[in-house]
Amino acid sequence: MYRFENDYSQGCIPEILEIFTRTNMEQTSGYRLDPYCKAASEKIARACGKDDLDVHFLVGGTQANFTVLDSILRPHQGVVAAQLGHVNVHEAGAVEGVGHKVLAISNGDIKKDDESKIYPDILDDYLTKFFAKGDWHMVQPGAVYISHPTERGVLYTREELIAIKSICERHNLPLYLDGARLSYALASENNDISLEDLAKYTDIFYIGGTKCGGMFGEAVCFTNSKYNLDFNCITKHNGGVLAKGRLLGIQFDYLFTDNNYIEKSRNAVKYAIMIKKALEDRGISFIVDSYTNQQFPILSYFQKEILDKNNITYNVESNVDENNDCIRLC
């Protein structure tokens, strides 16, 4: 079986497992108050060029998303996201479950090539019209959510990130960036956004571990102290505090040593691009132009049968027409 349906079908980077084993009998404080979490937090802050970065370790991406959004949104507010944003399509209503609507905006006919990305001009138009109307019967936008890379493996540019941040500031909204697969964006040759940029042009972002070589875990980073009030309590309230917190610290301490977070993801991006080129050379088209570890070719049912017969697994992303599906290779 050749598994291409996700990027978390194996355990973790072998060195992390070795450190787990080596430190297994150590006794440390719980709840992320251990030396490993402290060291990892300091290394992440240095990598982001921001000494006062407030780092919190959670277990999973959906948990991180609804906990962060629950902490920054008021009861009458929702979060603006792309149509294919993870919080809108792949979290079983987790954000709605804590009382906040996902306000999904469409790129429409103008930029319909990819509904996983928010374009600055479309965001600005949506927010400007909403607040100009002043309709207090409607759910009010209280934050903007984006991911880098997006659900379709598409990258934001630094220019787009700066523009989105500027729009958020103009409307007095926090910008939250989901980095579930951030390492693959940072490892891509087509990426021009750095960790320092994320620390400068977002209010909150998280650094993915689960899908980026770790066994589990995400590092939520507050760059703006306006939004981290009582976050430890809110995380506990939402069931997000791991008693054996050092298991999170150990992983991120390793990932942020010797640039491992980026370097360990380069092969995944390299081979994904090789697969992309091989399929393109055979006349296969893609639903988006991805330069990360996720690729989205459009295959006929006959072509999918060939993959099935050769024990190659994949995810069906969407139906394109009566003869073709878009699949995800990851």
Predicted features and spans:
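Nucleotide-binding motor/catalytic cores of P-loop/tubulin-like NTPases across gene-expression machines
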Residues: 315-316
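Conserved PLP-enzyme active-site core in the AAT-like
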Residues: 2-288, 292-310, 319-330
